[in-house]
Amino acid sequence: MLEIGSLVDGKYKILNKIGQGGMSVVYLAMNERANKQWAIKEVRKDGVQNFEVVKQGLIVETDLLKKLDHPNLPSIIDVIDGDGSFLIVMDYIEGRHLESVIREYGAQDQADVIEWAKQLCDVLSYLHSRKPPIIYRDMKPSNVMLRQMESHAY
């Protein structure tokens, strides 16, 4: 697990933990030279069975994602193959997961929901139009970010 305050790859300072999934932890990091925040997803060897197989899949996936260019998809900035972990540096999307918004506030305004659905359909259409098509198999409210002060779904 990355330490808060530690420096990764000589340039990314870990600020805090912002999320956790089944096999990964996501941190907010700062590239102090560029004065820019990034999200760093850490997949640890000790938290995954068949880590080498998972790592190879992540390498293929991140190589594919680096080539994507859509306003509602975070960009992959860097991949760091560390000793015992695999790190993916990506755009930090400031906002909340759709899941937490629904849990806290319940049903949402119809106009907002329609706008979010349009944006999600646009992203999925973009992914499906790639050659070969990209099929996103993990669509769920906890994987959709809603930006603050805007009605953009990521």
Located regions from the model:
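AlphaC helix of the eukaryotic protein kinase fold
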Residues: R44-K67
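Protein kinase catalytic-loop region centered on the HRD/HxD motif
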Residues: D122-I134
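Activation segment signature within eukaryotic-like protein kinase domains
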Residues: W116-A117
